[in-house]
Every structure is written in C-alpha cells, then in structure tokens.
Swiss-Prot record:
Assigned GO CC terms: plasma membrane; proton-transporting ATP synthase complex
Protein name in UniProt: ATP synthase subunit delta
PANTHER family associated with the record: ATP SYNTHASE DELTA CHAIN (PTHR11910)
Gene (UniProt): atpH
Family, per entry: Belongs to the ATPase delta chain family.
An annotated Gene Ontology molecular function: proton-transporting ATP synthase activity, rotational mechanism
Length: 186
C-alpha cells in the first residue's frame, strides 16, 4: 500500500471506529448501513460530489456547507452527518470512500458476515451469484455477500477474494502460468 493510501486508510479507520461504536450503542446499525449505501450510490453517480470531496480548490467552508446540504437532503443518520461535517472542517472528506468501505466491513463483521470480491469475465447471473455465495459460506463458515465486478481481460473463470484469501481460476492466470512454464523449459 502506498504511503498516502495507508494514511487515508488510517484516517478513515479512526472515523469508522467512532461512527460504528456510536451507532452500535444506539442500536442504529441498520440505519447507518442504509445511509452509507445511499452515500456510496451518490458518490458513484455524481461527479460533482466526487469533485467536492477531493478537490483542494474547494474551501473548507464550501465543503462544509455542501456536505451538510447533501446529508440533509439524503436524510443521513445524525452520527454520519456530524462526522462528515467534522471531516469537512478538517479537510478530510477525501477519505469518504475508504470510510464507507471500513464501515461496511465493521457492520458485516458485527453480523457475522463476510464480503467476497468476485471478478468475472461476464456478469454473474443471480443464480450463479447465489450458488457461489452458498459454496463460499460453507467454506468460511459465515454468511457471504458477493460484490461482483466484470473484467473482460480475465477471459473466463473467476477471481474470488474473501478476506486475505484469493482463489484465481481465471483463464488469464492459467495462460500466464503456462507461459512461465514454457519459459522455464525452453
């Protein structure tokens, strides 16, 4: 991990810990999860919102006013709204994507769930996704949520990451292995 990325992850982790603990104490984890999913969707959909949280050209005051308006409009839970306001005042809104990931991980852990990052050459059908989740759940002993992405460059097969474990059954990796074996022989 690069130094700026690890600094961002550290900042996001501290905010995530505080937000999670406050939400857990007030039994508001479901509301927090809804709010972070809404915020993540807004970040994915809005170039203006991404620019707002990352641009050094936007002043603290403008960031604070804009993020407050966005939080109010979206109806985010108070603990997240207040944290975003504090982050804007300290010019730390750039860590919001990492904060969302950290909060999702904490909520899933509290529920005994784990998220599997799955990369496939074509989009998985609902049936395939459910079957994969069931198979992975049997292997890891927890409820598994699939976060699927499509990458045509893997040609076929799957790349599955659950926690620190990775299973790469993609055709690309098999071709690379074959290529390396041929280099050793010839």
């Amino acid at each position: 991990m690069s130094e700026p990325a690890s600094i961002s992850a550290g900042i996001a982790d501290r905010y995530a810990t505080a937000i999670f603990e406050i939400a857990a104490e007030s039994n508001a984890l479901d509301n927090l999860e809804t709010s972070i999913n809404d915020l993540a969707a807004s970040l994915a959909d809005s170039e203006d919102l991404r620019t707002l949280i990352t641009s050094p050209l936007v002043s603290r005051e403008e960031q604070a006013a804009a993020i407050s308006a966005v939080a109010d409009k979206m109806g985010l839970v108070d603990v997240l709204r207040n944290s975003l306001a504090l982050m804007a005042a300290k010019r730390r809104l750039f860590v919001v994507p990492a904060l969302i990931d950290a909060l999702r991980a904490r909520i899933a852990e509290a529920r005994g769930e784990v998220t599997a990052e799955v990369v496939s050459a074509k989009a998985l059908t609902k049936t395939q996704s459910e079957k994969l989740a069931k198979t992975l759940a049997e292997r890891v002993g927890k409820k598994v949520t699939i976060n699927a992405t499509v990458d045509a460059s893997i040609i076929g097969g799957l790349v599955v990451k659950v926690g620190s474990k990775m299973i790469d059954s993609s055709i690309r990796s098999k071709l690379n292995s074959l290529q390396n074996a041929m280099k050793e022989v010839g």
